[in-house]
């Protein structure tokens, strides 16, 4: 397409800030920090003592794209379950430890890839950091120093009055210094708060204090809709500045939903290869079809598709043809029928009742061609087509 000059300087393409340089640690086989891809985490909701249920949930998370999984370990019975879970999990397992340092040692001995400790409720056992650091070194286990506004050290609450960004960072830096005193550096840090504004500022301050890998999270983010908004807002603000090495979306929802949201956040920022994307309009008085239903049915029909496919579902003749032409596959609807576009070309016109069926059939055909070719760009992707559009 020939560009048209309007006498204005061309804006550079949008890019994120350079990735913050950090140390790299390993959580099992997954690198965190430095040039490693930003990894995606979740946490099981099953009782850890129910080994089969926990492994089943881990398998579901793995299939959804989870890189690292955390399991709770509040009791001796949970600690006894860790060796089997750590051995049979397809992805690295982190044991989540509070109050009881003895479970830190148990998790390390069990073969967990990492252990999360909370300075807010384990700090009174700081005299055991030397032994924890040595055990972790001996077993190749990394540590997450996980500061949380809801369990901040009482001494810092008294000093600051509440869980301020400065309080969260002070807690994290103090604990980090103890591990570093014993020449242990294989740790990452999180400073979580339920307020995205406070959380973002805390991570900004922490990023200025050292080259530690950072685990991003908005704690207690809430139900699926609210938690998604909070996490997307906070992660977008930080990741666009190059801050963040691994993320966990916290939702009051099944863990697989956390992975779906996290994947979309990373894909939207081009921090993970884009897969299926559906672009749809919000609908208006011009729409001549039920855009909402079309978008939902197309999304459901293509769920699980792994190729980078852009599908456009458009509801009127204003933006419809243009959006459909820009997609790999699309429909511009109106007057009880839909024009089906593939790579910008109209290939057929179908009745409204056949739009969803036709789009799904064409998407499957494109997917088969993609698999046969190994990706049009030779690297598993369709050139210039990461999205599905519904308008």
Curated annotation (Swiss-Prot):
Pathway: Isoprenoid biosynthesis; isopentenyl diphosphate biosynthesis via DXP pathway; isopentenyl diphosphate from 1-deoxy-D-xylulose 5-phosphate: step 5/6. Residues 372-391 are annotated as: Disordered. Gene3D superfamilies: Dihydropteroate synthase-like, Sulfite Reductase Hemoprotein, domain 1. GO terms for biological process: isopentenyl diphosphate biosynthetic process, methylerythritol 4-phosphate pathway; terpenoid biosynthetic process. It is an enzyme of class 1 (oxidoreductase). Keywords: 4Fe-4S, Iron, Iron-sulfur, Isoprene biosynthesis, Metal-binding, Oxidoreductase. Binds 1 [4Fe-4S] cluster. One of its GO terms (molecular function) is 4-hydroxy-3-methylbut-2-enyl-diphosphate synthase activity (flavodoxin). [4Fe-4S] cluster binds at residues 281, 284, 316, 323. Its cofactor is [4Fe-4S] cluster. Its EC number is 1.17.7.3. SUPFAM superfamilies: Dihydropteroate synthetase-like (SSF51717), Nitrite and sulphite reductase 4Fe-4S domain-like (SSF56014). InterPro entries: Dihydropteroate_synth-like_sf, IspG_bac, IspG_bac-typ, NO2/SO3_Rdtase_4Fe4S_sf. It catalyses: (2E)-4-hydroxy-3-methylbut-2-enyl diphosphate + oxidized [flavodoxin] + H2O + 2 H(+) = 2-C-methyl-D-erythritol 2,4-cyclic diphosphate + reduced [flavodoxin]. Converts 2C-methyl-D-erythritol 2,4-cyclodiphosphate (ME-2,4cPP) into 1-hydroxy-2-methyl-2-(E)-butenyl 4-diphosphate. This is 4-hydroxy-3-methylbut-2-en-1-yl diphosphate synthase (flavodoxin). It comes from Renibacterium salmoninarum (strain ATCC 33209 / DSM 20767 / JCM 11484 / NBRC 15589 / NCIMB 2235).
């Amino acid at each position: 397409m020939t560009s048209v000059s309007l006498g204005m300087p061309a804006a550079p393409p949008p890019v994120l800030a350079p990735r913050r340089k950090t140390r790299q640690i390993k959580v099992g086989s997954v690198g965190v920090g430095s040039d490693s891809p930003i990894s995606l985490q979740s946490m099981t909701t099953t009782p850890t003592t129910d080994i089969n249920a926990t492994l089943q949930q881990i398998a579901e998370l793995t299939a959804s794209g989870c890189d690292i999984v955390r399991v709770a370990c509040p009791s001796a019975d949970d600690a006894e379950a860790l060796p089997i879970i750590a051995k049979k999990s397809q992805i690295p397992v982190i044991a989540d430890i509070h109050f009881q340092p003895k479970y830190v040692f148990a998790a390390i001995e069990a073969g967990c890839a990492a252990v999360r400790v909370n300075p807010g409720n384990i700090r009174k056992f700081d005299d055991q950091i030397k032994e924890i650091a040595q055990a972790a070194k001996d077993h190749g286990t990394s540590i997450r120093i996980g500061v949380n506004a809801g369990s901040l050290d009482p001494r810092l609450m008294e000093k600051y009055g509440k869980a301020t960004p400065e309080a969260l960072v002070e807690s994290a830096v103090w604990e980090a210094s103890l591990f570093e005193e014993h020449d242990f550096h294989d740790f990452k840090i999180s400073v979580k708060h339920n307020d995205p504004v406070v959380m973002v500022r805390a991570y900004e301050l922490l990023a200025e204090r050292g080259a530690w890998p950072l685990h991003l999270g908005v704690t207690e983010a809430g139900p699926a809709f609210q938690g998604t908004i909070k996490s997307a807002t906070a992660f977008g603000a930080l990741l666009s500045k190059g801050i963040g090495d691994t993320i966990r979306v916290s939702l009051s929802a099944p863990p697989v939903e956390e992975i779906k949201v996290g994947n979309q956040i990373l894909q939207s920022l081009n921090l993970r290869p884009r897969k299926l994307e559906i672009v749809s309009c919000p609908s208006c008085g011009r729409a001549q079809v039920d855009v909402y239903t079309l978008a939902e049915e197309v999304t459901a029909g293509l769920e699980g598709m792994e190729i980078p496919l852009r599908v456009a579902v458009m509801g009127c003749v204003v933006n419809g043809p243009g959006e459909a032409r820009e997609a790999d596959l699309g429909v511009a609807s109106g007057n009880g029928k839909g024009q089906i576009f593939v790579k910008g070309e109209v290939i057929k016109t179908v009745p409204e009742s056949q739009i969803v069926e036709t789009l799904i059939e064409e998407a499957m055909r494109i997917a088969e061609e993609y698999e046969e070719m190994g990706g049009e760009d030779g690297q598993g992707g369709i050139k210039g087509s990461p999205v599905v559009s519904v308008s």
